[in-house]
Amino acid sequence: MNAQLNIMEGAFAGMFDHAGMFPPAELNLREAVQAYREYQQGGHAFALQCMVVRAKDLDVLESALHENVRDLQLSVVAAGDDLDAVWKHLDREMPIKMFEMKATEPSQVARLKKMLPAGMEAYVELPMDLQDMQLADTVTEVGLHAKLRMGGVVAETFPSIAIVASMLRDLFKRGLAFKATAGLHHAVRGRYPFTYREDSARGMMHGFMNLLSAATLVWFGGEKDEVVEKLEEEGLLAWRVTEHSIRWRDWD
């Protein structure tokens, strides 16, 4: 059991951010902070990285929590117009570790890179159905990372398996690291409620184990049909944790 835990810690270290104020949880700020701190002390703390907040939440967070904010690690979701306000909070030593921004033009990416403090990670959300790869090329050239939106609160926001497989291969060709957001609330692909509300619609959602396995396969040169097969998997028992690896069917 200890060996299996070590494998899990190695595979999932810092892999998950806490986005408690976003769907499906939709907590208020205080509830989200409390939940994040509880997770920091929990049995899976090794897998936790940042608490995700919007740029507009920073003023409230700072004034409401005062010095108690220093033990957080924040990832700030912002638009280009928010950059100056975010840097103001950095000057006041807010614990901002990561920055996330949606971009539609290469010039927005270049501006973000120019303004970004040294050593801070930044992820640029790319359209999943990229026809023109200039945006991804610019993210690569300036040394930032990609962000993939894997779903939302309605079925139409979930990219198809074919689109996800193509995007993973496009990112790999560029050596572009990525994070994924939205819709990855379950380990394995399946039909789930989109939110925690009683009247929530249901639909097919991607699984984070599917995405992790597919991305790993792309890294090691897997063919597109093999990548698609992993993204399609709906059986939780298809994955097994051994002393030396996490296995998917016949793959380590």
Regions found by a protein language model. Name each.
Residues 106-170:
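Domain-core and long-helix interface of multi-subunit machines
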Residues 56, 77-81, 102-106, 127-129, ...:
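Active-site beta-loop-alpha junctions enriched in small/polar residues
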Residues 142-232:
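Catalytic alpha/beta core domains of metabolic enzymes, predominantly
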Residues 39-41, 134, 166, 199:
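Short, flexible coil/linker segments at or flanking structured domains
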Residues 52, 100, 125, 147, ...:
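Residues in well-ordered beta-strands of folded domains
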